[in-house]
């Protein structure tokens, strides 16, 4: 890691860290709050959304500062390029959609076409796969001109599909405190290392900036969370990670180039694939939320909130490690590493099955740590939320004063912790 990478990371981290409390207050003021209305939602009390705005602020300011101070003239030229303009416009669409959705939830059939437009803008202006190679086209006998045309069409379609798919994949795993942000951060670390190995300095700077922006937000998002990043953050992270992977590893679609980003982002990708298959098999709309995601299943096994997140961090990091080995060491060492990880993973799963406890009571106290019990007791005591003093919690109808009382500020929470 070079000095300018550290600068990019540090600036993003500082801005994101100090912006998050401000965004939290803003979310409460505008009513961007997640209300725990069903069993699918793991949190027990109303939680401010819009945390993604702090991540975005740290990311954008750090990117501008790092590139502008490195060479201002090149930075101006870079901003004026069609590709950059397309990324900016596409990102603004995703951010605007996310903010609106956090304040006034939208249906998937409304969000998807808008996300599709954002992805098409990005791809049409140059952020796309440029070459399709073996075994994708060479096995088909056709005229060279038709091959080039089909290659361009497929490359465009694959690029759009990848960006839209990953934008939603990160959002779908955003079900536990710190999960989506942490997994995105691990993916950004993997992409950073891959880009450094390949000598792609611009990609490395952007990845380092994303790492810093996420790191600044995570202290507020770890369990017990004080704020969620919401659709604003989850869709933005997925969108940017998709663009980074296209620019960094997917310019030419070979088996190797496709394997790297799929491994780096394997957890959200495979969780999304299984969610789609699961819903289709049960005859449900693929956009209908359920409690069948991997993180839900870990909780249902009896794991604590933090343990479930930690396990998924390890899985994501292991996949990222394989992608790095694939770039740096080649195919054979990567296969050996995969075998080692699978063996340890199976052993860990066996031990996990033995130590997890099936909850015997409805409160599931047997699976919580003392610290988690204290957090839950604090939540139950605070403003009488669990006793129904705020009647609007179940139907989501709360005014700003009620939201502020239900959520509580940091100082009141600390006082409760001291009393306990």
Regions found by a protein language model. Give the residues of each.
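Long, low-complexity, intrinsically disordered cytosolic termini of multi-pass membrane proteins
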Residues: 305, 357-420
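Extracellular/periplasmic helix-loop-helix junctions in multi-pass membrane proteins
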Residues: 323-337
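Membrane-interface capping segments at transmembrane-helix boundaries
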Residues: 22-25, 348-362
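Alpha-helical transmembrane segments of integral membrane proteins
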Residues: 300-318, 324-327
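Alpha-helical membrane-embedded segments
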Residues: 340-344
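"…together with the soluble PPM/PP2C metallo-phosphatase catalytic core" -> "…together
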Residues: 1-270
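Cytosolic, membrane-interface loops and tails of multi-pass inner-membrane proteins
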Residues: 22-47, 274-306
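Generic hydrophobic alpha-helical scaffold/packing signal
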Residues: 216, 242, 264-267, 274, ...
């Amino acid at each position: 890691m070079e000095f300018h990478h550290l600068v990019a990371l540090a600036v993003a981290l500082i801005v994101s860290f100090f912006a998050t409390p401000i965004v939290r207050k803003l979310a409460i003021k505008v009513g961007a709050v997640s209300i725990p209305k069903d069993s699918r939602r793991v949190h027990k009390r109303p939680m401010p959304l819009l945390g993604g705005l702090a991540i975005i602020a740290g990311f954008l300011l750090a990117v501008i500062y790092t590139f502008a101070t490195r060479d201002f003239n090149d930075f101006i030229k870079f901003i004026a390029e069609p590709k950059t303009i397309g990324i900016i416009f596409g990102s603004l669409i995703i951010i605007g959609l996310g903010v609106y959705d956090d304040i006034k939830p939208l249906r998937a059939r409304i969000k998807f076409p808008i996300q599709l437009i954002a992805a098409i803008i990005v791809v049409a202006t140059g952020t796309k796969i440029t070459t399709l190679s073996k075994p994708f086209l060479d096995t088909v006998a056709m005229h060279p001109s038709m091959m080039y045309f089909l290659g361009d069409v497929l490359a465009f379609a694959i690029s759009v599909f990848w960006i839209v798919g990953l934008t939603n994949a990160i959002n779908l795993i955003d079900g536990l405190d710190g999960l989506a942000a942490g997994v995105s951060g691990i993916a950004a670390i993997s992409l950073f290392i891959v880009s450094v190995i390949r000598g792609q300095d611009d990609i490395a700077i952007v990845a380092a900036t994303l790492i810093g922006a996420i790191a600044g937000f995570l202290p507020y998002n770890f369990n017990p969370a004080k704020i969620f990043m919401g659709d604003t953050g989850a869709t933005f992270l997925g969108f940017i990670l998709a663009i980074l992977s296209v620019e960094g590893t997917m310019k030419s679609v070979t088996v190797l180039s496709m394997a790297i980003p799929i491994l780096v982002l394997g957890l959200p990708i495979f969780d999304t694939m299984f969610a789609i298959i699961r819903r289709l098999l049960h005859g449900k709309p693929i956009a209908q939320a359920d409690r069948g995601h991997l993180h839900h299943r870990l909780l249902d096994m009896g794991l604590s909130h933090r343990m479930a997140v930690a396990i998924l961090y390890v899985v994501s990091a292991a996949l990222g490690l394989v992608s790095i080995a694939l770039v740096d060491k080649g195919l054979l060492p990567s296969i050996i590493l995969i075998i080692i990880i699978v063996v340890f993973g199976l052993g860990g799963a066996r031990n996990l099955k033995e130590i997890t406890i099936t909850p015997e009571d409805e409160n599931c106290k047997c699976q919580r740590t003392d610290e988690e019990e204290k957090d839950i007791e604090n939540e139950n005591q605070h403003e009488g939320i669990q006793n129904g003093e705020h009647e609007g919690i179940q139907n989501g109808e709360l005014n700003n004063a009620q939201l502020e009382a239900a959520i509580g500020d940091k100082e009141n929470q600390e006082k409760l912790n001291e009393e306990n």
